[in-house]
């Protein structure tokens, strides 16, 4: 049975970049650094849950770790006079034994970020809001914010049912197999009294053309539009000719031949 691949991983190297950027000398070091990245992300998601963490980017050098935290509420992370971010850096340095550099990046439109939308839906379900209402409200807010399309899926014991199931809603266009489509994906879990409910969100923010040397993406899109228009015109012309030809073939029967006289009918009369 076919399954859906992670949209971000499918587009890495095409229109998206890696969330972790570093090199390892051998397999053992690679495993240690990968586990350390996982622990850092797990710690930050739990520590800064109220700030709305959308994405964590990690870069490494010799003994330094640079982190870019994309959050919805930067003030919660920074704290009064920068006290919050200094305490956060101290905790991370104690955990990793390395120098930590933290950059805070504000997420402008939270309704178009798939991870934040999924977490908001999960939080609403934990507050006993009907899951259908929470999903539909999130879809409406995303479309009003300018998203090209959105798809939401909820799995688990929805509404406290005995048997788990999956329900989803979608609006607009979400082309998962189009690599140039900017698809944002988010996942969150809602902890309820009758078990966990998984929330998946796909948001399409339009198409992104890969930049190439000497090619302007806008010019390339205009050229492709002109080519598509010419192709459609040629296709319509062919269809029109075929349609006219079919009409002529259908109306040929019963018509009088052009340019000649009607043949005379002869009758044989007996003497």
From Swiss-Prot:
Domain of life, per lineage: Bacteria
PROSITE patterns: KH_TYPE_2, RIBOSOMAL_S3
Chain ranges of the KH type-2 domain: 40-108
Gene3D superfamilies: 3.30.300.20, Ribosomal protein S3, C-terminal domain
GO BP annotations, alphabetical order: translation
Compositional bias annotation for Basic and acidic residues: 215-247
Annotated transmembrane regions: none
InterPro entries, per the entry: KH_dom, KH_dom-like_a/b, KH_dom_type_2, KH_sf_prok-type, Ribosomal_S3_C_sf, Ribosomal_uS3_bac-typ, Ribosomal_uS3_C, Ribosomal_uS3_CS
Subunit-level organization: Part of the 30S ribosomal subunit. Forms a tight complex with proteins S10 and S14.
Primary role: Binds the lower part of the 30S subunit head. Binds mRNA in the 70S ribosome, positioning it for translation.
HAMAP family hit by this protein: Ribosomal_uS3_B
UniProt-listed PANTHER family: 30S/40S RIBOSOMAL PROTEIN S3, SMALL RIBOSOMAL SUBUNIT PROTEIN US3C
Full protein name: Small ribosomal subunit protein uS3
Source organism: Clostridioides difficile (strain 630)
């Amino acid at each position: 049975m076919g399954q859906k691949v992670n949209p971000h991983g499918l587009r890495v190297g095409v229109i998206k970049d890696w969330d972790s950027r570093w090199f390892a000398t051998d397999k053992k070091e690679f495993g240690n650094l990968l586990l350390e990245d996982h622990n850092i992300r797990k710690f930050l998601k739990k520590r800064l849950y109220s700030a709305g963490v959308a994405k964590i980017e990690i870069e490494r050098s010799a003994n330094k770790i640079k982190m870019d935290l994309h959050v919805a509420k930067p003030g919660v992370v920074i704290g009064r006079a920068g006290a919050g971010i200094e305490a956060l850096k101290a905790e991370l340095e104690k955990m990793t034994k390395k120098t930590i550099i933290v950059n805070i990046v504000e997420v402008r439109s939270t309704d178009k970020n798939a991870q934040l939308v999924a977490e908001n839906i999960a939080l609403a379900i934990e507050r006993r809001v009907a899951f259908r209402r929470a999903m539909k409200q999130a879809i409406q807010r995303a479309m009003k914010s300018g998203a090209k399309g959105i798809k939401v899926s909820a799995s688990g014991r929805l509404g406290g049912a005995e048997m788990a199931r999956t329900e989803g809603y979608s609006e607009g266009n979400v082309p998962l197999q189009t690599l140039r489509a900017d698809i944002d994906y988010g996942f969150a879990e809602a902890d309820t009294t009758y078990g966990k409910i998984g929330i998946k969100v796909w948001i399409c923010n339009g198409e992104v053309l890969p930049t190439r040397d000497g090619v302007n993406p806008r010019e390339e899109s205009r050229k492709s539009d002109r080519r598509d228009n010419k192709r459609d015109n040629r296709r319509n012309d062919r269809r029109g000719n075929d349609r006219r030809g079919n009409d002529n073939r259908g109306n040929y029967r019963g018509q009088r031949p052009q340019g000649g006289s009607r043949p005379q009918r002869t009758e044989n009369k007996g003497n």
